[in-house]
């Protein structure tokens, strides 16, 4: 019995009013709700994401729907850490 990880896609749903947040639970996992900016962050299965986005766009209380850009981002920061260390070393050398 092996644990299989399902790929998930984050979806940002901008609303006119937050009264319908409970209704969004049927489309996916409500991860975060911003009361001030009136948006909800949902997680859905990656293979079902396009269909869910189309269904959400048709709802009258939804202003707009956008996909999360996180899967497209490079999450390897090792090269950036080395670059920061080099810059710190050069600044220290210049001060001396």
Swiss-Prot record:
InterPro entries the record matches: DUF2129 (IPR016979)
Keywords recorded for this protein, A-Z: Cytoplasm
Cell wall biogenesis/degradation listed as a keyword: no
Entry's localization field: Cytoplasm
GO cellular component: cytoplasm
Pfam families in the record: DUF2129
Record family assignment: Belongs to the UPF0298 family.
The name this protein goes by in its record: UPF0298 protein LCA_1075
């Amino acid at each position: 019995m092996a644990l299989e990880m399902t790929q998930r896609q984050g979806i940002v749903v901008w609303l006119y009013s937050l009264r319908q947040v409970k209704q969004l639970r049927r489309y996916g996992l409500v991860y975060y709700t911003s009361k001030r900016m009136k948006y909800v962050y949902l997680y859905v299965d990656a293979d079902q994401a396009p269909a869910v986005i189309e269904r959400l766009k048709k709802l009258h209380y939804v202003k707009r729907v956008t996909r999360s850009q996180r899967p497209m981002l490079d999450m390897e920061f090792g090269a950036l850490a080395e670059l920061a260390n080099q810059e710190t070393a050069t600044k220290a050398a210049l001060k001396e």
